[in-house]
């Protein structure tokens, strides 16, 4: 019976298996995260503020002129009900505008979870924390594109 009591002691002193998310903030009070989408990589810093979003030193509405891309950028902040509460500064490189907008969105989502770990469930449910792994399929030899064959003439 002594063996069983030892097991009970181990079971009661064991730590919970679920990871505890801790707030990650630097000396300036900012949270940092990287986001990726297609060939674009974004580095994002967020801090409490008035809701100003800058991308590569420009206001996001100037950098991303299309309203669809602006909406993509704001999705995680709106979903977390933190609109106008954080200043967001992002630098993004590589890819096109659509990939860059997706990369910044991914970075904002991760930075929000580092700043407020309680938002993780909301953002994960919205699919903002998942890295979209779809990339362009490579071109194969003997074909016109990745899957398109050259035109075939029967005669």
UniProtKB/Swiss-Prot annotation:
Superkingdom as given in the UniProt entry: Bacteria
Gene3D superfamilies named in the record: 3.30.230.10
Any single GO BP term: translation
Gene Ontology cellular component annotations, sorted alphabetically: cytosolic small ribosomal subunit
Keyword terms, alphabetized: Ribonucleoprotein, Ribosomal protein
One of the record's GO molecular function terms: structural constituent of ribosome
Family per record: Belongs to the universal ribosomal protein uS9 family.
Protein name per the record: Small ribosomal subunit protein uS9
Organism lineage: Bacteria, Pseudomonadati, Pseudomonadota, Alphaproteobacteria, Hyphomicrobiales
Gene: rpsI
């Amino acid at each position: 019976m002594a063996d069983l009591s030892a097991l009970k002691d181990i079971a009661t002193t064991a730590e919970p298996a679920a990871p505890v998310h801790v707030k990650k903030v630097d000396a300036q009070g900012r949270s940092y995260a990287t986001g990726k989408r297609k060939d674009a990589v974004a580095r994002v810093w967020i801090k409490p503020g008035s809701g100003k979003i800058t991308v590569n030193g420009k206001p996001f509405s100037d950098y991303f002129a299309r309203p669809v891309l602006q909406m993509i950028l704001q999705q995680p902040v709106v979903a977390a009900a933190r609109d106008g509460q954080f200043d967001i500064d992002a630098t993004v490189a590589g890819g096109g505008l659509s990939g860059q907008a997706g990369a910044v969105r991914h970075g904002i989502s991760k930075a929000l979870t580092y700043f407020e770990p309680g938002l993780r469930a909301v953002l994960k449910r919205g699919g903002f924390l998942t890295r979209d792994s779809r990339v362009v399929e490579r071109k194969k030899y003997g074909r016109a594109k990745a899957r398109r064959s050259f035109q075939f003439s029967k005669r």
